[in-house]
Design a protein with these regions (language model features):
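Extended alpha-helical scaffolding segments used for macromolecular assembly and cargo binding
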Residues: 98-193
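Amphipathic helix/helix-loop-helix segment enriched in hydrophobic residues with interspersed Lys/Arg
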Residues: 1-9
Length: 242
């Protein structure tokens, strides 16, 4: 059934999900509608975003009565099937007021931030209309996403949302944007973000060294090997590994 559901078209999906939800109690359907604004659900998160004392019971009911949820390991988290989540989000945008949607995102942002989930917290902060707070939350996390986890698409998506002034106001974001450009061979873009970091005076040898590494990689990937070699030659011997 799930395979058939996954292969269904948009109209068929809407009909299938609508028919499925028609058999739910109204309270459960309303609960699912609000959960549709989340990427994954947890009983404590649901309790945080919904003013219902029985949120945990509704979570259990949703988990037990629908096959369209996938457990995320043994963490207590559940993930909605992408198609039903998309359907619920469309319904939410049509059924819930803008103020209620914003409040759900605001509560999700604050709860997720308290749990240390910077990326998801930032996504909800952005959806709630708090762009500056979202960018501040994600700034340091983006560097790790790029350099340690290789989630280049996620990094590129976040950077594309940020004004240049935000990126240049945060050193971690400048380095992240520089690496993102360098690893794709866009040496001009890499230079745009970190070029000034290799200009004297530069008291921080670690920062200077990493900026040189970014420029060396960007030029090397663009097959500007002579320029890359010059940046490599300038790398300070006392700079720590980045």
């Amino acid at each position: 059934a799930l395979k058939q559901f996954s292969n269904s078209g948009d109209h068929a999906t809407q009909q299938m999900v609508a028919g499925f939800m028609a058999h739910w109690p109204e309270e459960l359907a309303d609960f699912a509608l609000r959960c549709g604004l989340l990427d994954a659900i947890h009983p404590d998160l649901c309790a945080a975003i919904i003013d219902q004392p029985n949120a945990a019971d509704l979570f259990d009911q949703l988990r037990n009565e629908t096959p369209l949820l996938t457990a995320v390991g043994n963490s207590g988290w559940l993930r909605l099937h992408p198609l039903i989540r998309e359907y619920l989000r469309t319904r939410s945008s049509n059924s819930l007021s803008a103020d209620e949607q914003q409040e759900i995102h605001r509560r999700a942002w604050q709860w997720l931030a308290e749990q240390g989930d910077a990326e998801q917290a930032a996504r909800h902060a952005l959806a709630a209309g708090y762009a500056q707070e979202a960018f501040a939350l994600i700034a340091d996390h983006l560097y790790d996403l790029c350099m340690k986890e290789g989630h280049y698409g996620t990094v590129a998506d976040w950077l594309s949302r940020m004004p240049e002034s935000i990126i240049f106001s945060n050193t971690a974001l400048r380095l992240t944007a520089g690496w993102q450009a360098a690893l794709s061979g866009n040496w001009k873009r890499a230079e745009h973000y970190v070029g000034s970091l290799v200009e004297p005076p530069c008291a921080d040898s670690a920062l200077y060294g990493e900026a040189l590494a970014i420029l060396a990689v960007g030029n090397s990937r663009a097959e500007r090997l002579d320029v890359a070699e010059r940046y490599c030659a300038a790398y300070p011997v006392d700079a720590p590994d980045s």
